C-alpha cells in the first residue's frame, strides 16, 4: 500500500513532568480529559494522554491515534519525590521548545478563571503591548499560550467560559533556518503552510503548519482564522540564527530534559517509513530497530524528535 500524507494527523506533543497528579489536574482544569494511560512499570515510567473530548470537541470519541491535539505527559517514577528534579521548559537557556497553545471561547473570562484558581501566569492579558494573548504556567512551568476564538471586543464583557469549546491549537518550537525547516515539514512530513506572521521590527517570523483542508488566511470578524483548529505546528524563526554555524537549539532530550517529541499518526506505518527512507530522513529510531516495532522516530533539521505511529482507525496494527 502507498501512503498518503494528506491522511496524516499531528497527533500529540510529549512533555516530561515531575508529578503526574498535579499535571493531569492542571490539564483537566483546562477542560481536557485523560483519554489513555500506558503504564510501563517494568521500565519505571507511565504515559498519560490528555485531549479535548466533549461532544463539542473536534475528535470526540475517537481512538487516541485518530486525533490531533493530544498532550502526552511522561512521568519517570520517583521524580515527584526528588527535591532536585526540575524540568527544563525550553524558554530559558538552553532554548528550543516554546509552548503549547489553547484557544478559548471568551479569553478574558478564561484567564480570570485560571487566575482565580491560583495558577501563575508568565504573561497576563493586560501585560505588555500584546493584549490579545496570555501565557499561563503549568505545574512544571511549561508555557501554555491562551488565544481567543473571537475578537477581544466581542468577549470583553462576557463573564462565563465553557471549557468544552476549547481547542489544543498548536505547539511551538524554535527553528534555526526557516527555509530548511519549512521545506522539511512540507515536503517530507506532508504538512501545509497555513499561516505566516512576519515581525520584521522584532526580528522574527512565525509559521503555522498542519494537515487537513487548507485554511483561509482571513476571517470575517478579524479573529485568528486558525483559532478553531487543532493540530497546528508553529515554527518560530529568529532572524540571523541560520548564519551562525555554531548556533543550535536544544531538542529537550539531552540534559536538561523537558519537551520530548511531537508525533504524527499515519495511514500506513510501513509505507510511511518507506517513503521517509526515500526522502533520506535522519532516523532516531527506524521501525525495525529495538523491541518496539510499532513506533519510529525521525529527526527534523534542528534535531527535534518526531514520533511516527499508525492511525489505528485507518489500519489496525497495535493493541494500544
Predicted regions and their residues:
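Short, low-complexity disordered segments enriched in Ser/Pro/Gly and basic
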Residues: 4-8, 64-67, 91-97, 161-167, ...
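Conserved beta-strand in the GNAT
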Residues: 72-74, 145, 234-236, 307
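Short mixed-charge
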Residues: 56-67, 215-227
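Vicinal oxygen chelate
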Residues: 2-6, 12, 36-39, 46-53, ...
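Hydrophobic, helix-prone linear segments
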Residues: 1-75
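Amphipathic alpha-helical segments
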Residues: 18-34, 113, 177-193
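Short, polar loop/linker segments at the starts of domains and inter-domain junctions
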Residues: 83-92, 245-253
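Active-site/binding-pocket entry motifs
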Residues: 56, 76-80, 152, 215, ...
